[in-house]
Amino acid sequence: YLHSFLTRRSSDLGLGNRAVTPDALGPYVADHLEVNRHIVKEYGKYAMRTEQLIVLSAIVPGVMGQTGMETAEIVRGIVYETKPDLILAVDALAARNSRRLNRTIQIADTGIHPGSGVGNYRNAMTEESLGVPVIGIGVPTVVDAATIVNDTMENFITALEQSQALRSTGEILRSYSAAEKYEFVKELISPHLNGMFVTPKDIDESVKRLSFTISEGLNIALIDHNIFA
């Protein structure tokens, strides 16, 4: 998939807060990337022993609470100065199904909206706002209380459907869409639980392994992309 977007100049954004483990996926990925822009600028592309070269740079812009600036503002400045042809934005996500926690790697070509998964909406980073294509790569590392209750409710509905006396009730509940059931649960739970997010107990090791998996995949696709030719 990424191979179809490959260009001569790419920039990786390690989005997230390095100090908060579930949100440190992006910075960890940036740590393991084989960046080469500085070498190419100093010695030329032949220093990398190949003409089929993608110039790769990486940045960890931090979060607004650390910098006082919108991440999108920082990125726009970087795009203006370095003029990449493609932005790869890696960020942690909030799951809408607990089974997806630390298990799925999502890729989209529609950009990324930092903080939207936890209700902390920041400026979007898309092709329209930055002027270059933005590939979003993310892994769900947290889940909110409403999702946990909703997953439990799914098991409850299944149990109702298996009961002769309560089957009709289960079928009625099953007729609602996943989004409708989620919103229904969100309205029912206690207000103080709406801002509660949960992460698995092994999140430290999971984030390290996932970040290494993503970074190695990007290194192969971007640095050694000629193996796909």
Where are these regions (language model features)?
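Conserved active-site and cofactor/substrate-binding residues in soluble primary-metabolism enzymes
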Residues: 24, 28, 70-74, 82, ...
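Glycine-rich phosphate/diphosphate-binding loop of Rossmann-like nucleotide-binding domains
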Residues: 17-54, 58
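Proline-aspartate-enriched helix->loop->beta-strand connector
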Residues: 79, 84-85
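Gly/Ser/Thr-rich loops at beta-strand to alpha-helix junctions
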Residues: 14-23, 65, 92-97
